[in-house]
A protein has these predicted regions:
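Outer membrane beta-barrel
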Residues: 59-61, 65-157, 260-285
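Bacterial Sec-dependent N-terminal signal peptides
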Residues: 1-25
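Short glycine/proline- and aromatic-enriched beta-strand/turn motifs that initiate or cap beta-hairpins
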Residues: 19-45
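Short loop/turn motifs that connect adjacent beta-strands in outer-membrane beta-barrel proteins
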Residues: 18-24, 60-67, 99-103, 107, ...
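Transmembrane beta-strands of outer-membrane beta-barrel pores
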Residues: 30-36, 62-64, 71-77, 101-103, ...
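Exposed, low-structure sequence patches enriched in small/polar residues
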Residues: 29, 47, 51, 183, ...
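Outer-membrane beta-barrel architecture
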Residues: 57-59, 68, 95-98, 139-141, ...
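Hydrophobic, small-residue-rich alpha-helical packing segments that form membrane-like cores
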Residues: 131-214, 219-222
Length: 422
């Protein structure tokens, strides 16, 4: 398939000017393509060859108030590969009004929010991926002291130019323990989150109307070491696959993520362990597993190296948090880890004079080892076990700067991926 890009980002970024103590700012982004026939791939261009996604954002700030609106047009039709939800649509996508002072930050309308690492809640916009799951409702942030902040949200997740059937609510709190206890040797922060979804079950009382998730986290920095742990549990809910309830049983979900790292001049080490069991979360239970990530509540990225070059990025891993329990496929989630090591040679050394930098990465992700009881529709998963391997990547990168005009990058990569899953 061949594409002629007519205007990838006509212009994107901030434009602004002030007037009578107020301030306007915003931006325009236009991404267009013209699809052509490609005989080599047997691709015939659709009737709507010209496609365009366009975004116009305008904001105005006056004193402690800020208001904004975003107009979107997917005309004459949306770019190929985006959700049909946007097909031939245009109109006001988002709008908001915000008030902010030293202790209060209140937003009504559409807003974006993240609790912790995003494992329990993250709403965001990514135009390149066609994702916009902004919350429409009310957000209140309260910062009574420098050591404590509390955020409350209530609303519905955006779905195209509409909103989700499910109603979301949540509370997040962060406490600076080191400051509170006047401890200087270590930076210690404690966080707790709650996110709930209400969605009518119609006349089916076996489906819960309310599904809640609860999480806690602890982060630290001590000298050159840093780390954190976040654990979340989600109430039992039905399993949905392709818009249909696939099991009469209810299953709870859990998530655990642990980070540990070390940093000093010339050396950095970062490691992450994560275990997800039945931990997908959507504003509409029937949206679970949709390929466009519409109405998704939390953020569960694949924790692997983001390579610089296209050839390496052919092998992309997507996280597998879902529980699938049917005749053709059974899996309960994923478990794995990633380690990054960065090293820069001292500038006075031979390699340091060449600007030599070495980066190494290893990641391994597998399914949870579990036993399944088809008759009773139950399963039992081990904490780690020896589940099927989904993805493994070992890579080393060496960068040199030989002169002001010449530099080189040498990369070794050994990757295994199960494309049937990842």
């Amino acid at each position: 398939m061949k594409k002629l890009i007519l205007g990838a980002c006509m212009f994107m970024g901030a434009i602004g000017f002030s007037q009578d103590n107020g301030y306007f700012f915003g931006g325009l982004e236009s991404n267009s393509q013209w699809l052509l026939d490609d005989e080599d791939f047997g691709f015939t261009a659709p009737e709507d060859q010209f496609r365009s996604n366009n975004y116009l954002q305008l904001n105005y700030t006056l004193g402690k108030f800020t208001a904004g609106v975003q107009y979107e047009a997917y005309l004459p039709t949306v770019l190929l590969g985006y959700s049909p939800t946007w097909e031939n649509q245009n109109g006001i996508g988002t709008y908001y009004l915000n008030f902010k002072n030293e202790t209060l930050d209140i937003t009504g309308g559409y807003f974006y929010e993240q609790f912790g690492s995003g494992l329990i809640l993250r709403t965001w916009e990514d135009r390149q991926l066609g994702i916009n799951n902004a919350l429409k409702g009310l957000r209140v942030k309260f910062t009574p002291t420098a050591d404590l902040d509390i955020t409350g949200v209530y609303g519905q997740i955006r779905n195209g130019f509409d909103v989700s059937e499910g109603v979301m609510q949540g509370v997040d709190a962060n406490l600076d323990l080191s400051s509170l206890m006047k401890v200087d040797a270590i930076d210690l922060k404690l966080g707790a989150s709650y996110v709930g979804r209400y969605q009518s079950n119609g006349s089916n009382d076996s489906i819960p109307s309310n599904v809640n998730a609860y999480g806690g986290r602890l982060d630290f920095v001590a000298n050159n070491f840093y780390g954190g742990v976040e654990a979340i549990t989600k109430d039992p809910d039905v399993i949905v696959n392709e818009g249909t309830v696939s099991s009469p049983q209810l299953f709870d979900g859990t998530a655990l993520q642990v980070n540990l790292g070390y940093a000093q001049k010339g050396l950095g080490i970062n490691s992450t362990f994560r275990r997800l069991e039945n931990f997908s979360f959507y504003a509409d239970r029937y949206a679970e597993g949709n390929v466009y990530n519409e109405q998704i509540v939390n953020y569960v990225p694949g924790l692997t190296k983001q390579h610089d070059y296209l050839l390496s990025n052919i092998y992309v891993y997507s996280a597998q948090p879902r529980l699938l329990f049917n005749d053709t496929e059974k899996r309960a989630g994923e478990v794995g880890a990633q380690v990054d090591v960065y090293y820069s040679f001292d500038k006075e050394s031979t390699l340091g004079k060449l600007g030599t930098k070495i980066a190494g990465n290893f990641s391994y992700w597998a399914g949870l080892e579990a036993t399944y009881n088809d008759a009773e529709q139950t399963y039992d998963a081990k904490f780690i076990g020896d589940g099927d391997r989904y993805f493994r990547d070992l890579n080393i990168e060496v960068k040199n700067r030989w002169s002001s005009k010449w530099s080189s990058i040498a990369t070794f990569q050994d990757v295994i991926i199960d494309k049937g899953v990842a």
